[in-house]
Amino acid sequence: MPSFLRQLVPSSVDFWCFDRMSFGGELIPDFLLCYRNSRGFNWAYVELESPNVPPLIKAGRLSSKLNEALGQISDWRNWLRDNISYAREHHGLKQIDAEAPAFVVIGRRSHIRAEHALKYRALSADKTSVMTYDRMAEIAFTGAEIES
């Protein structure tokens, strides 16, 4: 899994993938990615949901799983804003930033109805990217760029 997730961050010599690291006991990202470049340590949060769960329901609203995943990311960021020194010093998360990019991978491309495509694209904002497993595979296997 780490080599698959590595495609989410810019290429660098140094890369680490932390599995289920705890923020404040109850807040646990599926993966925390770190890479080092000339700016130092850079971080990204990853939340994986089922490929069988659509990101949007028929009416074009967020599915409960996507809503939950986005809520978790918000909770991680809020915890880090309040506890940044603790995270850096006691968890060893050098230079971690509450505003680091986050990725939610959920569902398949076929789950997104044509009439909801614009709404789906608009979900990727504020340093959070929502993508299907198809998009994740496309990035990993073809080297496609992540759209910002």
Summary of predicted features, one role per range:
Residues 1-148:
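Charged, terminal alpha-helix-loop-beta segments
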